[in-house]
């Protein structure tokens, strides 16, 4: 699949005709909402694990030295916690551009903290996209992150901001926190 997924996402019609759509964020969308939204609520999606397996050549790395950012991996026993935003379809163009580095819009059932649910969408970078880096140990991922930077800043800032946002939500993530632990140890 192409690295730039904007055109693919613009052809998706699942939410055509909707005046508003819930968007589930599990990475930088938790702590950096640079788009207008009608509502924001802590939420989760079942059957997915957050993993630092996606390369970032556009935000937290470069073509020559990609950073690592999160995507979701199918995991029947897992629940991924994050933040849901109610947005209008007019925001899709901005979001598609922001998530262009291999992420596709997919429909998902979002569960809010009060146990109510809504159909919504999530951006997921699947293993068949050109920027996918794949599985590595948390220690190796931390070393990779420590040396990467891109137009949006050092890759380490992304990891640390995500870990802090998850703490503020009261939703620990063992994978994220273990990478953070290794990164802090590397910094000495």
Give the ranges of each region predicted by the language model.
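A glycine-rich, hydrophobic/aromatic-adjacent loop/helix-cap motif
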Residues: 1-188
């Amino acid at each position: 699949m192409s690295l730039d997924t904007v055109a693919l996402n613009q052809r998706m019609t699942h939410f055509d005709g909707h005046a508003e759509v819930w968007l589930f964020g599990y990475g930088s969308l938790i702590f950096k909402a640079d788009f207008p939204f009608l509502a924001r609520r802590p939420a989760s999606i079942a059957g997915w694990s957050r993993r630092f397996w996606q390369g970032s050549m556009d935000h937290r790395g470069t073509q020559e030295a990609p950073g690592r950012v999160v995507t979701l991996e199918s995991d029947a026993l897992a629940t991924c916690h994050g933040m849901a935003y109610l947005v209008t379809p007019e925001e899709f163009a901005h979001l598609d551009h922001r998530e262009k580095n291999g992420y596709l819009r997919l429909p998902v059932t979002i569960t809010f903290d009060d146990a109510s649910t809504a159909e919504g969408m999530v951006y997921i970078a699947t293993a068949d996209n050109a920027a996918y880096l794949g599985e590595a140990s948390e220690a190796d991922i931390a070393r990779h992150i420590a040396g990467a930077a891109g137009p949006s800043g050092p890759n380490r800032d992304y990891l640390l901001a995500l870990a802090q946002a998850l703490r503020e939500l009261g939703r620990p993530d063992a994978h994220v926190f273990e990478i953070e632990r290794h990164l802090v140890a590397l910094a000495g």
